[in-house]
Amino acid sequence: MLTFILLQTLLIGTPQELSSAAESLHNPYVVYNAIEQPIDYPCGDIPSDQGVCTDVIVRAFKIMGRCLQEEIHEYRLSKGESTGKNIDHRRIPNLAAYFASLNMESHEYLEPGDIIWWKLGGADGINHIGIMLDNGMVMHNIGRGQVADVCPEDYHIHRIYRLPE
């Protein structure tokens, strides 16, 4: 399993590629839908006209040729944690634990391609996540589609993840 994780680290892509992938996802007509649905494995997805904030992350990685559904499932299996192929990759704490395992945490300045984990309403608030774009905005889905309509500081930043260069 360690070999799998190390290999994934080498194949991860660049922050600029992630920013570009996220920007390509702009679609204000994506309907917010957090309901667990059966999806194909590996690399399945709910219908592209539906999604939540985590689906922005998963879809951007998929554009770069990465399957977070499979990677997070395998990561959780390697840790002896319960798994659900339809939903694990669509939960912020699971994404965060996986990104931290790849040494992606960063608490410095923001750059395009950074993955921002917010706490809406303050430090104990609701989880939300998005990807920093070149224009200083963040691609996310908070219920108004997959759009870049917020600045990073609009919400309480909990963690920042950056792909290794």
Question: What is each stretch, according to the model?
Answer:
Residues 67, 119, 163:
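Short regulatory "switch" loops immediately downstream of catalytic or recognition motifs
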Residues 32-51, 72-73, 77, 118-159:
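Glycine-rich catalytic cores of cysteine/serine-nucleophile enzymes that process amide/ester linkages
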Residues 19, 77-146:
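...with weaker cross-activation on analogous glycine-rich loops/strands in unrelated enzymes
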Residues 5-100:
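N-terminal capping segments
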Residues 103, 108, 152-165:
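Short, low-complexity, Pro/Ser/Thr/Gly-rich segments in the mature regions of secreted, periplasmic
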Residues 1-2:
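N-terminal hydrophobic targeting signals that begin at the initiator methionine
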